[in-house]
Amino acid sequence: PVAADEVEEALNAKLEDKLNCTVDINYIALSDYTQKYSLLLASGENIDIIYTSTWAFYNEEATKGAFAEITDELLQKYMPQTAAGEDSMAFEQAKINGKCYMIPKNSPYVNNAMPVLIRGDLREKYGIDKIDSVEKLEEYFTAVAENEEGIYPYAAAGDAVEMSMNLFQSRNNLVPMSCGSGKYFGYFYQGKDPAAEDVVWQYGTDEYLEYCKLMKSWADKGFWSKNAVSNTTSPLDAFQNGTSAALFWNLDTCESAKNVVDSEHPEWKAELVNVTPGVVHVKGVYTGDGFAIPAVSENQERALMVLDVLKFDKECYDICRYGIEGSTFNATSDTTYTLGDEQANYAVSWGLKNDVLERIQGEAGTTQSEIRQELMGDAISEVTSGFIFDDSSVKSELAAMNEVCSQYVPLLELGLVDDVEGTLAELNSKCETAGAEKLKEEFISQFTAYLEGLEK
């Protein structure tokens, strides 16, 4: 972020006063983390605090011994505010074989709170009413594809996982379940917690086949580039620079992108829309964002003290989450804020999010946005959020399957194949060869034991 140095300087002024220490913050680009994250930890570089997540190798790195254990004693001694103020379920969800290696955010992720950010000016230009279904979104995409030059309806890139989370998982009430970095298992929510026999192999479901067929039809209509898999410009950047008419992402990211666009291009009339109304919104894990202490850190206790302050001290929290008051944000009350003129120069930090101290954008008295209430206000808790799969006995099978899926899944989910059914059958066949059956047996065994443990 452009304002990163200024934010770090302001934060260090507070930390020197409160803890007699400073931090030196380094960033890994989102486009590079899959290649660089594990290499950085393996290098032995003396890092004291590092972002981690269920989607950013938490399970894999923790089981390799890359992270220090976070015990209850350490929390009580060095993170008393966190120990007292954070939901204990967050630390339960972070446990692997009974041990915790993460300080999760104090804000549960809602698995399917997935809006779409669109260009309101283009919607109005082509006379399209409120977009509140996948069919209406397709109408909007078709109008853009047929009439606009230099703008894709959706500038997909890489694996387009954000789109599949919305239009496959959320649309079908499919709750994904933790299995390393793969998207292999889940269950269809039907008003009750699942039994072990309700767990499905996602790539073998009729719903996944229908999703891939829909993506094939959209790709054939030119909704994204034929080279989308190798596209290195993120959909977020594409929307903000005007080469994409939509953005699929989680609610926080879409709201942040809307803020940037509203500031830089108000004439685009950016709109957040919900194309899957009526689906069940399920609270997922706290471990969707958090921080770990690398095992090589020489300052582990001090690192925990710093995290405690960043998460629960109001002054430090505002700096970390919103930047510089009067520049990147303006506090309008103790609980609200408006965007500053330099807001685009600083991005909010995910891993520290704490619902106790979060501000709502707007003037004093502002309440949550309608779209946020719609997507998150009725979220329910369910049993699988605390289940973390231990992949230590199937690492080779998972590695082989990840390799297979990296070749097939992006093409299927972007519709860039000639024969959807044939390609999907080939994917499943190669996964079987790679060890899918062994993986499923181990997964079901662990999930069964997890359910039995909840009954004791």
Summary of predicted features, one role per range:
Residues 1-456:
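Extracytoplasmic/secretory soluble proteins
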